[in-house]
Amino acid sequence: LKNSHLHFDTSIGVKKPESIRNKQQACPFCAREELTNLIEVDGPIILLKNKYPVLENAYQTVLIETDDCHGELSTYELPYLHKLLQFALRNWLELDRTGKYESVILFKNYGPLSGGTIAHPHMQIIGLNDINYKEGIAEEVFEGIDIEEKNGVRLTLSTKPKVGFYEFNIDMDDSSYNETFGVHLQKSVHYILNNFPFKASSYNLFFHHYNRRIYVKIVPRFVTTPLYIGYGIPQVPNNLHWMADDIKSKYFSDSGSA
């Protein structure tokens, strides 16, 4: 039987460590010798079962990206970033292919407004027993103003964002990993954290497998508008073309700064 809502176990939730705002909290991901239920290890990259499985009817895993607690995706060396993304995408798609779950999600939280609790760089892969996330996704949320198209990889700025305001999309063919995908992803995140027109300290990455393509939606996070919270109405800003030109000039022109 399919479901529309995930059920959250508060008795587990209250035990979760919080190290984004609480800097005195010991980082559980740094104590690598104490980690349990490891699934796969590739050098500093570790996939393991989530110690605090707060979601019912779900298989929850955590992907620790690095052994550097203060690392951040926009500053990883490119070979390392490609290795990390290939590791994440492979494990996500393999779990989906098992057919055990209604759908499988791969996402990342970064920063105090992202909804995350642990500051150490990580992603999550979650198998949902009775929810198909794809049923709530319209193709139009991936459409937008072209920023860069190269080697079969496209970067756009949403004209019909899912939640509202600014959402970047990158897509590539699902047959194999394309390094341009990683380059575009890193540049987009760097733009959000360093050159955004408003101070941005948080973002989410949401990966989607749709029509034989891999998408990542990159969402800078601010306090969510009440129009979306209360009524589900996304807002579209009137400076999208300016922003597309801004990131293009800073990151994708010959004289770009990054």
Question: Where would I find each of the regions flagged by the language model?
Answer:
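Conserved, mostly hydrophobic/aromatic
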Residues: 122
